[in-house]
């Protein structure tokens, strides 16, 4: 929870009950309203070649009508039962299209009136975009044809979008696999009026276990029945002309994942029994492999209900987890299994092992690599090269390995070993590119791969691109940003031979825009031209300040002062300080600066920045580190350090 300090105490006294009953929603003062009631710049979705841009426009905030709609909280989900989609969705209300190097965007044609668009998904050939539109009665499936910029409705409002994206493209891009509401769906139970048939019974078997507190849990049999009704769908194949055909019968479908070549699909369904102490991601589930016409190939995995986990953040479930398709193969499943029983207290040389199984999935799984820490992912290259990462929360350690996925006898080589909170030592992430199956694999030129990093240093933030020689393991810096008057963020490498890189640039008063930066010629070319919607605070003073805690720990915060404030007079102002305590395992990491004074000033929901227009000083994102070195945990001295952090900022 964020901590808000203010020098003013607001007291409401002497208000009668009648006055409270007659109170209506109020508009904020003019200075704040001018920052709230603005047309914000769109978000951007690009194809893999970064040639086509879809501009997505949203309202800045939800309306009171949106916030007043019916909401059911079940099993970790928040659902609008009238429309069958998550009640937390932020909708898009308009779409425009732009070629990367064109200056002006074009309006998409054929969109519905009062559009409430969500669940966007590029087709495998990237010539179309699927999305949903939410009406007063439900969710429709739509597609956008990129060459013509024509949007078209495919279905009526019969989709079930209560769990995840309800539309999934077939590999040929000629049809969608859609979650539909069942024909004979049971009516929901009104839990406020329903009389229970019996008591709610939970069983304790005496097993020692640790569980966190979850929100929105199931509470009784009526909740169970409603959860099952709301999450049950039928799968139908819907062509681009709108023709529908049954694909799979009603079940609680949680995820659908086609193999890279589109021949197979892994279908995961929620099973019973449900739980009253954990959310749906810990409910039993079953993963079945189908072919692309809906015929069952094999049951790949059955996960039981997981209510009990070992103690610790690095505890894991037993059995197969993190199941997915290998990106560089047509149809190979990959997953991890804990070698320590999922218990971080067990001392073992390797925590996890990664396995693979190739279609038709009737052979024995093959172990391909083991990890010292807990497995966290693989970036695939080819038969001989892949990049593996693991992590261990207790020490904040991250390791990156290069390994040969075809030869498990060859020991993986560690190429990075660092504390992930030590941002000054972060080596960056390997750049990827889309392959023939539409999956992202290592971006390689000969023996070279490429890393892009945020570039935090003691002197500021300077993002970089490194060339990594896979044979020699040596790195060569190809580019490092030198801007001190603006912030540059590396988005993607477009063409390493030409030196073309897609970046974003911004400053305190310049909205983030995309540029093509030729790193060989050091010449950026602007490709989007989004305007600053918050010009009313252009003259506000913004400064990254540095100060020390009583024990000498370096701290930072972003200080905003009202426009026209004369610093030389040192006139006292009421101040709002906004902070979030963060845990660290060493003082070196805790003292590092991760803020950039050139970040665009973006007042969003819950931001204290609005109040600088009302004469307040605002200290935003003040450092509140809680350090526990060695065997000492941060929580051991949480309160004293919290007080010291606040005192340092105020003093």
Feature roles, as predicted:
Residues 7, 19-523, 529-539, 554, ...:
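Beta-propeller folds
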Residues 16, 145, 615:
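Conserved functional loop/turn residues at catalytic and ligand-binding sites
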Residues 271-272, 328, 379-380, 384, ...:
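Serine-hydrolase catalytic core recognition
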Residues 3-15:
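Sec-dependent N-terminal signal peptides
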């Amino acid at each position: 929870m964020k901590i808000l300090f203010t020098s003013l105490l607001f007291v409401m006294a002497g208000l009668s009950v009648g006055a409270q009953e007659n109170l209506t929603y109020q508009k904020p003062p003019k200075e704040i309203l001018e920052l709230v009631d603005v047309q914000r710049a769109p978000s951007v979705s690009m194809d893999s070649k970064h040639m086509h841009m879809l501009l997505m426009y949203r309202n800045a905030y939800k309306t009171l009508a949106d916030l007043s709609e019916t909401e059911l909280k079940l099993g970790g989900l928040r659902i609008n039962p009238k429309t069958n989609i998550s009640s937390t969705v932020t909708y898009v209300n308009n779409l425009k299209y732009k070629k990367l190097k064109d200056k002006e965007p074009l309006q998409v044609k054929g969109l519905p009136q009062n559009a409430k668009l969500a669940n966007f998904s590029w087709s495998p050939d990237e010539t179309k975009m699927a999305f949903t539109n939410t009406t007063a009665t439900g969710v429709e499936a739509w597609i956008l044809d990129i060459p013509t910029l024509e949007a078209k409705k495919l279905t009526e409002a019969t989709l079930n979008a209560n769990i995840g994206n309800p539309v999934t493209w077939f590999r040929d891009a000629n049809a969608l696999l859609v979650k539909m509401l069942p024909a004979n769906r049971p009516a929901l139970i009104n839990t406020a009026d329903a009389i229970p048939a019996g008591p709610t019974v939970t069983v304790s078997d005496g097993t020692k276990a640790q569980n966190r507190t979850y929100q929105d849990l199931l509470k009784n049999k009526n909740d169970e029945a409603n959860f099952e009704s709301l999450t049950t769908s039928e799968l139908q194949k819907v062509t681009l002309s709108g023709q529908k055909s049954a694909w799979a019968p009603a079940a609680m479908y949680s995820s659908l994942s086609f193999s890279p070549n589109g021949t197979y699909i892994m279908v995961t369904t929620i099973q019973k029994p449900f739980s009253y102490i954990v959310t749906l991601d810990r409910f039993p589930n079953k993963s079945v492999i189908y072919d692309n016409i809906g015929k069952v190939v094999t049951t790949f995995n059955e996960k039981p209900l997981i209510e009990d986990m070992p103690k610790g953040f690095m505890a894991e479930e037993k059995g197969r987890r993190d199941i997915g398709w290998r990106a560089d193969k047509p149809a190979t499943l990959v997953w991890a299994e804990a070698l320590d029983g999922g218990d971080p207290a067990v001392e073992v040389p390797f925590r996890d092992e990664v396995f693979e199984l190739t279609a038709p999935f009737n052979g024995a799984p093959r172990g391909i690599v083991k990890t010292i820490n807990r497995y966290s992912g693989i970036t695939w290259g080819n038969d001989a090269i892949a990049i593996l990462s693991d992590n261990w929360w207790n020490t904040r350690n991250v390791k990156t390995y290069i390994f040969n996925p075809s030869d498990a006898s060859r020991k993986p080589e560690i190429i990075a070993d660092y504390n992930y909170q030590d941002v000054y030592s972060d080596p960056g992430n390997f750049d990827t590119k889309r392959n023939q199956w539409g999956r992202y694999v290592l971006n390689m030129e000969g023996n070279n791969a490429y890393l892009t990093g945020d570039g935090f240093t003691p002197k500021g933030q300077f993002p970089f691109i490194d060339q990594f020689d896979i044979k020699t393991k040596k790195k060569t810096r190809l580019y490092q940003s030198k801007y001190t008057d603006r912030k540059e963020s590396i988005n993607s490498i477009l063409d390493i031979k030409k030196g073309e890189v897609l970046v974003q640039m911004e400053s305190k008063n310049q909205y983030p825009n995309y540029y093509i930066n030729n790193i060989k010629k050091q010449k950026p070319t602007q490709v989007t031209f989004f305007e600053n919607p918050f010009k009313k605070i252009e003259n506000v003073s913004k400064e990254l300040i540095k100060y020390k805690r009583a024990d000498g720990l370096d701290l930072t915060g972003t200080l905003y002062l009202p426009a026209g404030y004369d610093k030389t007079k040192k006139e006292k102002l009421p101040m709002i300080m906004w902070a979030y305590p963060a845990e660290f395992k060493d003082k070196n990491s805790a003292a590092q600066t991760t803020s950039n004074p050139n970040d665009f000033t973006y007042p969003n929901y819950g931001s204290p920045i609005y109040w600088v227009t009302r004469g307040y000083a605002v200290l935003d994102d003040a450092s509140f580190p809680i350090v526990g070195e060695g065997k000492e945990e941060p929580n051991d001295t949480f309160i004293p350090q919290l007080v010291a952090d606040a005192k340092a900022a105020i003093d």
